[in-house]
C-alpha cells in the first residue's frame, strides 16, 4: 500500500485574504509553508524596462507570532545590481537594491496586496554598529537561506534572523530568471570577506558571492 499526495487548491481573492489576515490566523487557515499564489507586477509607463510580469509567490516560513514570510518562487525578469558601484558599504540600508524594490517595484504590486504587506524590521551589524530599516519589500538574508552556522563565516552581520523553513535544502533554493534558466540571485547580506561583494545564491542552490555592481537575479520577499 502507498499514499498518493495531491495538492488542494483554494479559490479566493484579495478581500477574503485580507479578512482572514485581520480576523484569523492566515497561516493556519490559508497560507501554510509551501503554499503558492499568483501576483502581478504592472508595467510602468515611465520606464520601458518595467514591463508587466506574472510571478508566483511562495510561503517560505511562518514566524512564532504567526507572520507569513513570502518570497517569489522564481526571479523577476529584470535583473538588478545591489549597488551602482562595487561596494557593500552601508549594507542593505544604503543599497541601491533596497531603494529600487521599495520605490519602484512595490508600487507595481496589486494595491490590495500592498495594503496587506506588513513592514518588517531588518537588522544588520555594519562597521560595529547595529543598523535597522523598516521595509515592505526585501531580499532574504544569508541566514534565512543557509542558516546561522554557515552565516557565522559568510555573513556575521545578520542580526536576529533564522533560516526560513522552505530553504533547508539546496533544491528548494534554486530559482530561474525568465528566458535564462536557473540563475544566481542576490541576498541582502554583505559578504564578510570583501567590501566589494554581497552574498548570493548560486544557480545550483549553494552559497556564493558577487560584485555589488553586477546585475543578478532578484527574488524579493514580503511579510503578511
Q: PLM ranges: what are they?
A:
Residues 1-224:
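Collagenous Gly-X-Y triple-helix signature in extracellular proteins
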Amino acid at each position: 500500500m502507498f499514499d498518493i499526495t495531491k495538492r488542494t487548491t483554494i479559490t479566493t481573492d484579495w478581500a477574503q485574504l485580507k479578512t482572514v489576515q485581520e480576523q484569523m490566523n492566515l497561516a493556519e487557515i490559508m497560507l501554510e509553508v509551501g503554499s503558492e499564489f499568483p501576483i502581478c507586477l504592472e508595467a510602468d509607463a515611465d520606464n520601458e524596462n518595467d514591463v508587466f510580469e506574472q510571478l508566483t509567490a511562495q510561503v517560505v516560513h511562518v514566524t512564532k507570532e504567526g507572520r507569513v514570510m513570502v518570497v517569489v518562487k522564481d526571479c523577476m525578469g529584470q535583473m538588478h545590481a545591489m549597488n551602482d558601484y562595487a561596494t557593500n558599504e552601508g549594507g542593505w540600508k544604503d543599497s541601491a537594491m533596497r531603494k529600487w524594490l521599495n520605490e519602484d517595484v512595490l508600487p507595481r504590486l496589486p494595491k490590495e496586496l500592498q495594503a496587506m504587506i506588513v513592514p518588517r524590521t531588518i537588522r544588520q551589524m555594519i562597521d560595529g554598529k547595529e543598523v535597522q530599516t523598516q521595509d515592505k519589500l526585501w531580499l532574504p538574508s544569508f541566514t534565512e537561506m543557509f542558516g546561522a552556522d554557515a552565516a557565522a563565516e559568510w555573513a556575521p552581520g545578520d542580526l536576529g534572523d533564522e533560516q526560513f523553513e522552505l530553504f533547508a535544502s539546496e533544491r528548494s533554493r534554486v530559482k530561474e530568471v525568465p528566458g535564462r534558466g536557473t540563475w544566481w540571485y542576490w541576498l541582502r547580506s554583505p559578504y564578510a570577506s570583501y567590501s566589494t561583494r554581497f552574498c548570493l545564491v548560486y544557480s545550483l542552490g549553494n552559497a556564493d558571492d558577487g560584485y555589488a555592481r553586477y546585475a543578478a537575479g532578484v527574488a524579493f520577499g514580503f511579510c503578511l
